[in-house]
Amino acid sequence: MSFGEIIVILVVAILVLGPDKLPEAIVQIAKILKAVKRNIDDAKSSIEKEIRINDLKEEAKKYKDEFSSTNENIRKKLSFEEFDDLKRDILDKTKVDLTFDSRDDKVKNNLSGQNLNTEEKPNLSKLETQDKNGKINV
């Protein structure tokens, strides 16, 4: 609105309302416009909050879907049966028998280095060879 339009509106308002009711009318109009503006601002902020909430929900849904698909891919790649087979294979490969029979004196003697007869000594000629310099090759 230009300044001329505002003056025309004021002149018409003075003629219709009169000079004594005009100040009250202007105050009432200002209160109404202020309330309307406040309601519009509240509506805008509510809409913006809803939009942010919807964006957050969509983002959370994306993360949930991504997590679910990754979880499903892992389940497809490694079923429980395969996991049990893998576990069994690992246990079989890493199993070491460290038990000794107390009746086996040869094992005890060989481990402790005691009472070795020439008959009980292992034949190392097949495993080790000695070169001219005295170096043992395995």
From Swiss-Prot:
The chain crosses the membrane at residues 2-18. Its main location: membrane. Residues 109-138 are annotated as: Disordered. Pfam families: TatA_B_E. Residues 118-138 have a biased composition (Basic and acidic residues). InterPro entries: TatA/B/E, TatB. It comes from the Bacteria. Gene3D superfamilies: 1.20.5.3310. The keyword Nucleotide-binding does not apply. Keywords: Cell inner membrane, Cell membrane, Membrane, Protein transport, Translocation, Transmembrane, Transmembrane helix, Transport. One of its GO terms (biological process) is protein transport by the Tat complex. GO terms for cellular component: TAT protein transport complex. Part of the twin-arginine translocation (Tat) system that transports large folded proteins containing a characteristic twin-arginine motif in their signal peptide across membranes. Together with TatC, TatB is part of a receptor directly interacting with Tat signal peptides. TatB may form an oligomeric binding site that transiently accommodates folded Tat precursor proteins before their translocation. Belongs to the TatB family. PANTHER family: SEC-INDEPENDENT PROTEIN TRANSLOCASE PROTEIN TATA, CHLOROPLASTIC. This is Sec-independent protein translocase protein TatB. It comes from Campylobacter jejuni subsp. jejuni serotype O:2 (strain ATCC 700819 / NCTC 11168).
